[in-house]
Amino acid sequence: MQEVKKKKRKFWIIFGSVFLSLVVCFLTIGQIGAFSTAKTLHFWRPNYAKVDIAPLLEKTELTEDDYQLLYRQTGVTKLGIDDMREDEAGKKRILEIQNCLFADYSTYKDCFGLFTYTEELGKKGAEQYSKLARLRTGDVLVSTSMLVSWWRLGHSALVIDGDAGHILEAVQAGWVSEISSVTTFNTRANFILLRPKVDVEMKMQVADYAKKNLVGLRYDLTVGVLSKKYKKEQKKSHCGHIVWRAYKEFGIDIDSNGGGIVTPEDMYYSEYMEVVQVFGLDLNLDKLW
């Protein structure tokens, strides 16, 4: 009997030691990954001169060279420029966007979870803000600024009310998906504003569905791997999945590679997406991600 007890005690001691070693190993590797990835800051400022673009905005018609210059000066594509330069308020916004692109921002990393960081503008408690192009309901925002250990996962959100600046997003473990202000992207070190190539009526339906059915979902990054990617009654989601799920309800698959986990990067490369604006990422590159 004593021999059996000794064997059991020995087993649990060995098991506990191995388990503790694995936990320490996991935490160490995870933290090393977080420190390593945190050094690769994704924030870019133009390495060329700022020029006066106001005269261009007054032209009746713009050439391709004009649009290219405006893109390099603002990060806004033809799609976004044409959407804003129709009125004086839009022209003013374009000039404000240019000022933000060339502004001398400071940046910091905010740790908000286990091995999880975001890259932000300004300082903790004294954030700085960039300027977004005119939002349209159904737009998608993506950013490379969110890191999980070795993985630059990024973040994304669905614009559910362009005029009000309201977005639907799933932020982190322990939280549920919620409607928030788009200003959460204004403080990120970078973002890309995408516009799905579907008609306005469809995008309004997508936004309405999202508001009624995708708010309050528990955050779970394993959706699509440990559980089905598409469920009629969705209970769990994450930042990329929740945007994908809203469009998928109407037969539009914005996941470019069809994998289990839908990432912001997958949506950036979707054939359905057009770029409206880029901030904080190198405008000299054809592929921003």
Could you describe each region identified by the protein language model?
Residues Q2-V18, V23-L114, E233-W289:
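Activation targets extended, charge/polar-rich intrinsically disordered C-terminal tails
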Residues T63, T77-G80, K131, W175-T184, ...:
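Short, solvent-exposed coil/turn linker segments
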Residues S106-W150:
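Short N-terminal edge-element motif at the start of the domain
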Residues F115, K131-L132, V182-F185, G216-L221:
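Short amphipathic alpha-helical segments, especially helix-boundary/capping motifs
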Residues L135-K197, G224-K231:
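Glycine-rich catalytic cores of cysteine/serine-nucleophile enzymes that process amide/ester linkages
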Residues F191-L193, E201, Q277-F279:
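Short, intrinsically disordered/low-complexity patches at protein termini
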Residues L194-N257:
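Active-site nucleophile-His-acid catalytic modules used for acyl/amide transfer and hydrolysis
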